[in-house]
Amino acid sequence: MGGMKSCYHEPVLAPESVSMLVRGPGLYLDGTLGGGGHSLAILCELERSGWLEGSLLLGIDQDDEALQEAGERLADYREHAVALKGNFGNIAALSAREAGSRGMEPQASGILLDLGVSSHQLDVPLRGFSYMQPGPLDMRMDSGATGTAADILNTAPEAELASIFFRYGEEPLSRVIARAVTTRRVEKGPFHTTDELADLVRSVVFGRERVMKSLSRVFQALRIAVNQELEVLERVLGDGVMLLKPGGRMAVISYHSLEDRMVKRFFSSLTTADWGPKGVGLREPVRPAAAIAVTGKPVRAGAEEVARNPRARSAKMRVIEKMENRE
C-alpha cells in the first residue's frame, strides 16, 4: 500500500484533521476525495485503532481522474471505502443512498471537506485552472458539465464580468479588467486559452506583485463562477451538519478568505445560542447552540509541511462537534 507512485500531492493538514475527526468506528464522509490522500489517512487511523470493522468511508468527487487515482490508492480498503462520482453539494442524497444500500444509517461520525482546486488540477494544463501554463480556458471540476470559463469570458456583459471578478476574486481593478475583456472581444474575437487571458491582465495591471495578485484573483473568480463553488459550499455545510450524528465532527479546510469567512460565519451560527432581543432577560435561549467549536482559531500548517507543500501555506482548518440531543 505504501510507496505507490502518485501525481497527486500529499493531503494538507492530514495528521491534524484525522486526529480531530477519527474517534471511533462509524460512517465517515470525505466530500472532496481528490486523489484519496485524506481518505487513506482516515482509513489507516481506523485500522490502527481497531475501529475499521463496522466502519465505512464514502469519498465524493466529480473529477474522473481523481476518482480513478483514489480508487487505486484505496484498493486495499475496498471493503470499507467507496468512491462516488458526484458533487459534494449532493452529499446528503449520495450518502443516504450508499449507506442505505449497506444497511447503515446515514449518520456520520466525521465529515471532511478540503475546499478549492487540487494541486493536481492546477498542474494539468488541459484543465485550464492555472495562468502559469497555457491551456484551454476550461476550469470545470466536472469535465462532463456544461459551461466553461471561456463561455463566461466570451458571453457575459461587462457589468457581469466586473461583478464576478470583484465578488469571487475581490479584485480591486475588476471594472478595468472587465472593460479590457469586452474591448478585446470586439477587437480580436473570443478568448480560447489561459495565456490569452493572462496577457490581457498583464496589459492593464502594472507592477509585478500587483500583476501576480490580479492574475490569481481573476482566475479564482472565474473558477468559482464556473463551478458555483460558494453556492455549493453553503448547501454542503447545512446538509453536512444535518448528517452528523450527535458527537460527530465536521472539519473544513479552506484556502481563501471568501471560503473561510463563509465557514467561520456558519460555524459561529451553530456554536452560539440565540438569547433573543437584548434586555428581555430570558432564562432559556430561544435557540440553543447546536455545536461546539473544537478549534478556536483555525488550525494552520506548520513550517515543515509548508516547506514540503507550499499550497498548505494558505490553508485554514475549522472543526465543530455536533452537540448531543437535549430533548
UniProtKB/Swiss-Prot annotation:
It catalyses: cytidine(1402) in 16S rRNA + S-adenosyl-L-methionine = N(4)-methylcytidine(1402) in 16S rRNA + S-adenosyl-L-homocysteine + H(+). One of its GO terms (biological process) is rRNA base methylation. Its EC number is 2.1.1.199. It is an enzyme of class 2 (transferase). S-adenosyl-L-methionine binds at residues 36-38, 61, 88, 114, 121. Pfam families: Methyltransf_5. GO terms for cellular component: cytoplasm. The keyword Methyltransferase applies. It is found in: Cytoplasm. One of its GO terms (molecular function) is rRNA (cytosine-N4-)-methyltransferase activity. Its main location: cytoplasm. Keywords: Cytoplasm, Methyltransferase, rRNA processing, S-adenosyl-L-methionine, Transferase. Belongs to the methyltransferase superfamily. RsmH family. Specifically methylates the N4 position of cytidine in position 1402 (C1402) of 16S rRNA. This is Ribosomal RNA small subunit methyltransferase H. It comes from Chlorobium phaeovibrioides (strain DSM 265 / 1930). The gene is rsmH.
